[in-house]
């Protein structure tokens, strides 16, 4: 819920770690309100802050859970309240791009600005959010997110979501 997300964001703020929201909460931050229920929070953290973020999670009673998709740069954390953080580690390249899991993305990808109630957050900007929803089998939450992003930010709805 929104209180849990705000608390997790506050942990990062207190630790002076810059985070970028992705996924459903990233969409809702761009919209400025919670548009649906979420089962986790997707967070990107720069490589230089990754270990500190993990230590902060552990200090707040989160533990790592192994999933079939976890890697060195993509870990999942849960606590006793069943709050789940989907944590992604990226780095900036010398060419000013974002490198994540071997793929490069334009620096503007992280230029989104949003809010979770009164907390201002950086997030994936709207067009990139829509593009990242392509090329896989999507569910009703994806349809909800893409349609809201396209309506709100005047982005053409991709064919597979029509």
Each predicted region: which residue ranges?
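Compositionally biased terminal segments of proteins
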Residues: 1-162
